[in-house]
């Protein structure tokens, strides 16, 4: 079990501990539960889905990297496939606050980058901030997404974001988590191809500036992140954050990164290179390359 889970695991009910122990045994547990594992945990504990998600929130919060605030927020995104995806807030010392990943963004990006096509619900241990409510409004689940908070009845995103502004106001038809492929040819080595594939998956309807980042760890594992724009612009999630989020959720740390590649268009209206390189250098990675989409 990864050390980050030990304290939270000790606080779980005994029957949940017994059922989860084999799942968490891998130090690189991927911070997700398959539909089969969710069913197994429900049977082992007698909990329904909402109650089980609440019981698991301490494990999601343990995934947070709150190096500045020391305020761990955890979220669990529940996919239509039945898979549950953990997420936690991420803060990057030496970078800027604008590089922060919120827990809801973490869980949603996690689900999206794992190939989930839509969400039924998201469970969070603290009320979503306005930034996250706006981020969630970009999803193809729209204002019907169910939000579960401890001690409260479930509500929809529409309840938390009345009179919402979103992609439909800008006549955007393809939404976040809809399948997209920008069609750029996969060239170069495996890491470069991973970055291009991530760029192809980008949700960039406002700037037409697709981009992707791929990170290679010292053991050869590769984690990729895709760019996710938002109708309100500021809640946009850069591709580096998507990749760092996956890396961290899988039990790796920033010193494990030995090489990084950004894929983007040379003539794009928005460029990720400077912010990507600055953040990676703040995290101790200086082996950073850029490949141009063509």
UniProtKB/Swiss-Prot annotation:
Keywords: Hydrolase, Metal-binding, Zinc. Binds 1 zinc ion. GO terms for molecular function: cytidine deaminase activity; identical protein binding; zinc ion binding. One of its GO terms (biological process) is cytidine deamination. Pfam families: dCMP_cyt_deam_1, dCMP_cyt_deam_2. Residues 48-168, 186-294 form the CMP/dCMP-type deaminase domain. Belongs to the cytidine and deoxycytidylate deaminase family. This enzyme scavenges exogenous and endogenous cytidine and 2'-deoxycytidine for UMP synthesis. This is Cytidine deaminase. It comes from Enterobacter sp. (strain 638). The lineage of its organism: Bacteria, Pseudomonadati, Pseudomonadota, Gammaproteobacteria, Enterobacterales.
């Amino acid at each position: 079990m990864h050390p980050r889970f030990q304290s939270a695991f000790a606080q779980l009910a005994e029957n949940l501990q017994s059922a989860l122990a084999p799942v968490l045994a891998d130090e690189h547990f991927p911070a997700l539960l398959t539909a089969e594992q969710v069913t197994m945990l429900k049977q082992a504990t007698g909990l329904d889905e909402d109650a089980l998600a609440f019981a698991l929130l301490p494990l999601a919060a343990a995934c947070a990297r709150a190096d500045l605030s020391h305020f761990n927020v955890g979220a669990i995104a529940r996919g239509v496939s039945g898979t549950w995806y953990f997420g936690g807030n991420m803060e990057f010392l030496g970078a800027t606050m604008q590089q922060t990943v919120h827990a809801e963004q973490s869980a949603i990006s996690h689900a999206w980058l794992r190939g989930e096509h839509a969400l039924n619900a998201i469970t969070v241990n603290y009320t979503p901030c306005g930034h996250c409510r706006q981020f969630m409004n970009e999803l193809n689940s729209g204002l019907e997404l169910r939000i579960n908070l401890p001690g409260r009845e479930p509500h929809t995103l529409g309840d938390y974001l009345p009179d919402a502004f979103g992609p439909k106001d800008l006549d955007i038809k393809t939404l976040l988590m809809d399948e997209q492929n920008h069609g750029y040819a996969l060239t170069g080595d495996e890491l470069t191809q991973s970055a291009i594939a991530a760029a192809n998956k980008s949700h960039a309807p406002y700037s037409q500036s697709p981009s992707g980042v791929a990170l290679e760890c010292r053991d050869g594992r590769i984690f990729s992140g895709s760019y996710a724009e938002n109708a309100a612009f500021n809640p946009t999630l850069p591709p580096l954050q998507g990749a760092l989020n996956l890396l961290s959720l899988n039990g790796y740390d920033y010193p494990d990164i030995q090489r990084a590649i950004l894929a983007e268009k040379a003539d794009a209206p928005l460029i990720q290179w400077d912010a990507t390189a600055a953040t990676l250098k703040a995290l101790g990675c200086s082996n950073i390359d850029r490949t141009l989409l063509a």
